[in-house]
């Protein structure tokens, strides 16, 4: 199959298996959920009554004081006591094998092509790391919410995009399923397309 280059009067021949396969919604959902789960820190930690600092001695005798009975200063109902169901550090990551991950990326890229959300250009670069230059370039292309993918990371482009809302720049090796579906449009250079094809082959 062929993808038309927007900034040149030519087309780029690409693999049908990468850019023309059927959309597998279940697979994409599983991989996106796993990717998001892997990004969770999971570092929360609270102390149970067994872990809180304090004496194990009964605060006062059981009967005769007129006060409510108490067996420990570490009780969850006391101030500074332990937490009843204390949250602990957790690894939320889910296993996704390489074949599934690559399959999901191919499904997403193919769907972007079908929905006319993937724009392929010969090259995408800036003369200087100026946000204004990038903003004007995107305005000329009628793009706002966009992910730009280049073969190698363009430093000028990366620096210029940092201050633009809903604009992100990646190199071909840095693509992920969540980023690909998060933006309205995806702009890829011809080099990036070839690199992604090799990566997913």
From Swiss-Prot:
InterPro entries: Ribosomal_uL4, Ribosomal_uL4-like, Ribosomal_uL4_dom_sf. Keywords: Ribonucleoprotein, Ribosomal protein, RNA-binding, rRNA-binding. GO terms for biological process: translation. This is Large ribosomal subunit protein uL4. Residues 51-73 are annotated as: Disordered. Belongs to the universal ribosomal protein uL4 family. One of its GO terms (molecular function) is rRNA binding. NCBIfam families: rplD_bact (TIGR03953). It comes from the Bacteria. One of the primary rRNA binding proteins, this protein initially binds near the 5'-end of the 23S rRNA. It is important during the early stages of 50S assembly. It makes multiple contacts with different domains of the 23S rRNA in the assembled 50S subunit and ribosome. Forms part of the polypeptide exit tunnel. GO terms for cellular component: ribonucleoprotein complex; ribosome. Part of the 50S ribosomal subunit.
């Amino acid at each position: 199959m062929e993808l038309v280059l927007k900034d040149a009067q030519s087309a780029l021949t690409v693999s049908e298996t990468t850019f023309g396969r059927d959309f597998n919604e279940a697979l994409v959902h599983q991989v996106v959920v796993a990717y998001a789960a892997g990004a969770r820190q999971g570092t929360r930690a609270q102390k149970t009554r067994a872990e809180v600092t304090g004496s194990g001695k009964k605060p006062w005798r059981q009967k005769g004081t007129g006060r409510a009975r108490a067996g420990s200063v570490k009780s969850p109902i006391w101030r500074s006591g332990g937490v009843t169901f204390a949250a602990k550090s957790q690894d939320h990551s889910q296993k996704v094998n390489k074949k599934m991950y690559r399959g999901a990326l191919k499904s997403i890229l193919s769907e972007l092509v079908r929905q006319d959300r993937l724009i392929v250009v010969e090259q995408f670069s800036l003369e200087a790391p100026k946000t204004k230059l990038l903003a004007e370039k995107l305005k000329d292309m009628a793009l706002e919410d966009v992910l730009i993918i280049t073969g190698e990371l363009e430093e000028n482009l990366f620096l210029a995009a940092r201050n633009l809302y809903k604009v992100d720049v990646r190199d071909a090796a840095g693509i992920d399923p969540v980023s690909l579906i998060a933006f309205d449009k995806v702009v890829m250079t011809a080099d990036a397309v070839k690199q992604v094809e090799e990566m997913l082959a």
